[in-house]
Amino acid sequence: MNINNEILQLMKDESLIAFENDEIPVSCIIVDRDGNFISKGINDRQSSRNVLGHAEINAIVEAEQKIGDWRLDGYSMIVSLEPCDMCNAVIKESRIDNVYYFLPKKTQDINTKNNINKVEIDGYNQEKVYFLELLTSFFNNKR
């Protein structure tokens, strides 16, 4: 997938906002078939006091509100970290076509058969390093 510079910068900015708000620094963008920005989301479980406050779910909710439909056929998700099981289930139900992620999860989920087209993004090494450094710094500060 070819990701334009504006979306890359937005993802970096959003991850930094999450980090500065003491949230796990994950960002998510939803784009249409042409790669145009539709919605964004960051983790906000602590500030929202809501277990559903994952970047992917927040981006999906914003996209649904923007387009006026819960069906997101024809849309793709770009996320800084591979989605968890909960997010995978919501992604599947929302019918998002493709999920592209920069960093793979380090933990194995329980549900490995989710029938979602997930692809780790090739290249973009600077962005991968950026997201990894934010996540590492966040968790190092928690220890």
Briefly describe each language-model feature range.
Residues 24, 71-73, 95:
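Short loop/turn motifs at secondary-structure junctions
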Residues 1-21, 83, 89-143:
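Zinc-dependent deaminase
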Residues 69-81:
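Immediate flanking context of iron-sulfur cluster ligation sites
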Residues 39-45:
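Short beta->alpha transition motifs characteristic of CBS
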Residues 68-69, 113:
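Short secondary-structure boundary/capping segments
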Residues 47-57:
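A short, polar/charged loop-to-alpha-helix boundary motif
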Residues 39, 56-65:
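Glycine/small-residue-rich phosphate/adenosyl-binding loop
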Residues 26-35:
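Short beta-strand scaffold segments in enzyme catalytic cores
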